[in-house]
């Protein structure tokens, strides 16, 4: 992580499905579990500028957790919102970090964001499914939370403050069932 960003007072909210996906963020930002909040597991730094919520898997959980985090953390319109998680892919390589540049699901197709930063990692389209998919030929990235996260945060913040990043976890050469072994 960029030390300038780490040490700044930029307000950031992370929505992550699973604890294993969140570990590096919790360590980097020195976030601790806050037992005050019981609907979801919530972590924050001492200054209350960095918050992370574990949403659980699925669009409904992601939408509920994002809304809950917005309310309890008193996020402003200029708060940065980041969704980090795993995704299946037939195009990338296992472990690649990808920036999402378009999101779709069975109900909608949203272009995201207004402008893309210049970064060195892959930019890919994301399809959010309600069930795990193993046909990787139809979509660049497949997850189960991204579109709901974007739908909610797009109402809470400007598009330029929303970021979705996915790590490729499964694909034609890495079976989704292998994820359960960890």
Question: Predicted regions span which residues?
Answer:
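Glycine-rich phosphate- or other oxyanion-binding loops that anchor nucleotides, phosphorylated ligands
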Residues: 36-182
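Short, conserved "active-site rim" segments that organize catalytic pockets and cofactor/ligand binding
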Residues: 9-33, 43-44, 50, 96-102
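Short linear motifs in intrinsically disordered
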Residues: 4, 29-35, 89
